[in-house]
Amino acid sequence: MSITMSDSAAQRVQAFMNNRGKGLGLRLGVRTSGCSGMAYVLEFVDDMNDDDIVFENKGVKVIIDGKSLVYLDGTELDFVKEGLNEGFKFNNPNVSSECGCGESFNV
C-alpha cells in the first residue's frame, strides 16, 4: 500500500506547512459527494486518530484514515499549473469514472 507525491506537490505542501507554522502533516481522504459518488478531502493534521495510517514521501507526512485507504491506495498527489489555474491533482489508479466537471469520482 502506498501514497506518493510529485516533487511539485511536496514543495507546495511544505510551503503551506511552513506558512501555517504547525501541524503533523496533510490528511488525504474521501467523502461522499458529487454526481459520481466520492470527492477528495485535503486538510492539515494537528492530531492523529487511532485508525490513521502515515505515509512519508519527500519529507511530507500524508495521513489517511483506514476507510479512505481502500479508495486511495496507489494514488499520487501532484500539483499542476495550467494557464492561470493551479491546484492539486490526484492520479488515482482505482478510479473507474469521473463526473464531467471533475469534482467527484467512482471506483
Curated annotation (Swiss-Prot):
Entry binding sites for Fe cation: 35, 99, 101
InterPro entries found in the cross-reference section: Fe-S_cluster_asmbl/transfer, FeS_biogenesis, FeS_cluster_insertion, FeS_cluster_insertion_CS, HesB-like_dom_sf, IscA_proteobacteria
Any GO molecular function: iron ion binding
Keywords, comma-separated and alphabetical: Iron, Metal-binding
Cofactor: Fe cation
GO cellular component: cytosol
Co-factor remark: Binds 2 iron ions per dimer. The dimer may bind additional iron ions.
PROSITE patterns in alphabetical order: HESB (PS01152)
Record GO biological process: iron-sulfur cluster assembly
SUBUNIT field: Homodimer; may form tetramers and higher multimers.
PANTHER family: IRON-SULFUR CLUSTER ASSEMBLY 1 HOMOLOG, MITOCHONDRIAL, IRON-SULFUR CLUSTER ASSEMBLY PROTEIN
Role description: Is able to transfer iron-sulfur clusters to apo-ferredoxin. Multiple cycles of [2Fe2S] cluster formation and transfer are observed, suggesting that IscA acts catalytically. Recruits intracellular free iron so as to provide iron for the assembly of transient iron-sulfur cluster in IscU in the presence of IscS, L-cysteine and the thioredoxin reductase system TrxA/TrxB.
Family to which this protein belongs: Belongs to the HesB/IscA family.
Protein name (record): Iron-binding protein IscA
